[in-house]
Amino acid sequence: MLATDRTTLAQFLVEECRGRAGDDSELLGLLLDVAQACKTISKMTAMGSLAGVHGYNGDVNPQGENQARLDLMSNQAFVRATERTGHAAGLASEEMEEVLGFPESYARGTLLLVFDPLDGSSNIDINGTVGSIFSILPMPRPGEAPQTADFLQSGRQQVAAGYALYGPSTMFVLTIGSGVHGFTLDPLLGDFILTHPSMTVIPESGEFAINSSNSRFWEPPIRAYVDELLAGRSGPRSKDYNMRWIAALVADVHRILLRGGIYLYPRDTKTPDLAGRLRLLYEAAPVAFLMEQAGGRCTTGTRTMLDLVPGSLHERVPLIFGSAVEVERVETLYREPQRREFATPLFNQRGLFRD
């Protein structure tokens, strides 16, 4: 392993790929393309209102969500960083309804890039933390124009995944299947420098992240789990927990990699037609890859995330990840037979969060 003293992202990737079987030059090149896109986005977010990036443009993305100006600018940064380099065969993004192939006159690589160009965009106007999430998959039909079916692969097929975090400093965190490593952007040099080698998720922690305003819509296992945590020292867990919620998935992933804990965005009955809220292909799957590489766990509650195969580009799933002990406890509660829900409130299953 290279020393952390001023090791750049490019140097790190060259060293990592040198010990692997096969030619990883396209993977190395595509990761550097993604890093370049993230540098561009970092600069735009840092400029804020001075660059005219705040506010919404009146359009919606394929999921019906309002698109911020910076959503579209970030998406374009990914496209421009990858379209002419010959490292990718095609792209899929939260902000694009269909997959994007490149003109025949451009060189095509053998890898597919999927991404959420700007996670947590509701934080933009309040100068809150935002980020980017990405995943790299093999192209099943090298040399051909990419189709939607080419992208619908299980998380086990990922060859790399990671995120950028645009906070007080900009960080780029990734895995290529040999651990999770974090790099901090040196704004003077313009390079990502290795600062967090071999990041691991501690098996137990006293923090959890969930949007408690949805508690009345939670499934019984989630209610039971959160009730255990809120009971504190006098409850079954025999310790106090703190709740965190940043409204940016990337920020919660980063905190858990550094401090442990658990993140829950479960399925609920608020919108019963949705299986979950977060997208499998370019949010849940890359997070799952990072978590497993760092010694954590990731699940829907009933299924291991990396085993899922998306049925569509923008398929949604429940997402629960973090310290292994905590995630396993949630999985155990989902496996237990459901308690009978009595019609009479006096005998109904109760929790600390009331309906």
Curated annotation (Swiss-Prot):
Annotated substrate binding sites: D119, G120, S121, S122, N211, Y263, L264, Y265
Domain of life: Bacteria
Binding locations of Mg(2+) 1: E94, D116, L118
Reported cofactor(s): Mg(2+)
GO MF annotations in UniProt: fructose 1,6-bisphosphate 1-phosphatase activity; magnesium ion binding
Keyword entries, A-Z: Calvin cycle, Carbohydrate metabolism, Cytoplasm, Hydrolase, Magnesium, Metal-binding
Top-level class of the enzyme under EC nomenclature: hydrolase
Binding site for Mg(2+) 2: D116, D119, E283
PANTHER family, alphabetized: FRUCTOSE-1,6-BISPHOSPHATASE-RELATED (PTHR11556), SEDOHEPTULOSE-1,7-BISPHOSPHATASE, CHLOROPLASTIC (PTHR11556:SF35)
NCBIfam families registered for this protein in UniProt: PRK09293.1-3 (NF006779), PRK09293.1-4 (NF006780)
Protein's name in the database: Fructose-1,6-bisphosphatase class 1
Native organism: Rhodospirillum rubrum (strain ATCC 11170 / ATH 1.1.1 / DSM 467 / LMG 4362 / NCIMB 8255 / S1)
